[in-house]
Structure formats: structure tokens, C-alpha cells
């Protein structure tokens, strides 16, 4: 049975990371920026799993670290969305350009 080569995983991870980076740098909506940052983090997780499974010395360390990173990312997304909801209630917008002032 043939396995998918490591270059396919790495290419997919690079494409996902570049899409996330482009979205995070060009979009003005805070929710979209958070989603793009999660996409970049998932690309890094894909690299961890690919190197763990197809690396020179395959072991489970990269996969376990990827699961840990996913749980931290879920907590980060929850906190980020909670802060975003609080800012929306205060400013009535989620546009990044409008959130440059610290005082109300």
C-alpha cells in the first residue's frame, strides 16, 4: 500500500498558512482575522503531525503536541470571541480600523 508523500502534506500546510496569512493581513473584520489565525495554527499542526508520522524517527510526540496545541487554540478562540463581543457592545463595530482608541 502506497503512502502519501511528506511533500504533499508540507505543500498543503504551506498553502493553508499562506491563505491564513493573506487573510489576516488584508481583512478588516476581526472575526475573519481570528479565523485566519486559526487557519495558520492548523497549518502548523499539520506540519507537526506530518513530521511526527513521516519523519526520520516516527513517534507520537508531534501528534500529542498537536492535540495540546489544538486545545490551547480552542481556549484562545473562546477568549478572543468573548473580548470581541465586549468590544462590539462598547463600540458597535468589529472593524479593526475603528478599534484604535483605548478609551471609550
UniProtKB/Swiss-Prot annotation:
InterPro entries attached to this UniProt entry: NADH_UbQ_OxRdtase_chain4L/K (IPR001133), NUOK/Mnh_C1-like (IPR039428)
GO biological process: ATP synthesis coupled electron transport
Keywords: Cell membrane, Membrane, NAD, Quinone, Translocase, Transmembrane, Transmembrane helix, Transport
GO cellular component, one term: plasma membrane
Single GO MF descriptor: NADH:ubiquinone reductase (non-electrogenic) activity
Transmembrane segments annotated in the record for this chain: 4-24, 31-51, 67-87
Cell compartments where the protein resides: Cell membrane
Record carries keyword Magnesium: no
Protein topology in the membrane: Multi-pass membrane protein
Domain of life: Bacteria
Pfam families referenced in this protein's UniProt entry, alphabetically: Oxidored_q2
Annotated catalysed reactions: a quinone + NADH + 5 H(+)(in) = a quinol + NAD(+) + 4 H(+)(out)
EC number(s) recorded for this UniProt protein: 7.1.1.-
Main location (coarse class): membrane
Subunit record text: NDH-1 is composed of 14 different subunits. Subunits NuoA, H, J, K, L, M, N constitute the membrane sector of the complex.
Stated family: Belongs to the complex I subunit 4L family.
Primary role: NDH-1 shuttles electrons from NADH, via FMN and iron-sulfur (Fe-S) centers, to quinones in the respiratory chain. The immediate electron acceptor for the enzyme in this species is believed to be a menaquinone. Couples the redox reaction to proton translocation (for every two electrons transferred, four hydrogen ions are translocated across the cytoplasmic membrane), and thus conserves the redox energy in a proton gradient.
Protein's name according to its UniProt entry: NADH-quinone oxidoreductase subunit K
Gene for this chain: nuoK
